[in-house]
């Protein structure tokens, strides 16, 4: 598979898990489906290949020990999504349909820096356009991790790498007006005035407030970073799809406060369903 030493193992996942739905759930932009049923996930410097064998059984290729120490947390496998669906499925017919339709989605715990840059880029962009921009950044400025049937595989670029790249090079990756926001965040992260790892110790509201201080970060982007980068599953990003859902399905009344610390997971079911079936 290239430069990284990858070890192949068979693992069991007994809870809801559907890689196709995860890839299409709008929370991740680099994972992809490959030939012969393989899925590739890249997060930080970690690389995973996963292929379903039979119900609940998967072949995985990753660095030795990384399935237990990294990918188990990345896929939030310590939480029972089946139990969550069972607890909530009688509250609302629309919610019940959405959870059944989205069964297999999981909220990924992704790299904080990658999530910050990706969701700054995401503003007023389609998901395919976000994927192209994020992949171009990785190919041009990220560290090469290895290669597979599709060619070289790269890590997402560090803040230092983006600073060195400069404005023109980032513009060429399709960032548009978002370039200056990404560069400003990269400069702060490279200088140490923005330490995303340290922010993990903050409570939800303080974390959200600190992210909101960054140029180009509004409520939606800050909540996306909280949810998908820090695992704060009570946070609810509100985009045009969620706005429509609240208007059309809940008579304009925000349904998410009733779901408390699991509202962000419910949001993923509803977002996926609304975006898929309208």
Write out the residue ranges for each language-model feature:
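HhH-family (HhH-GPD) DNA N-glycosylase catalytic core used in base-excision repair
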Residues: 1-278
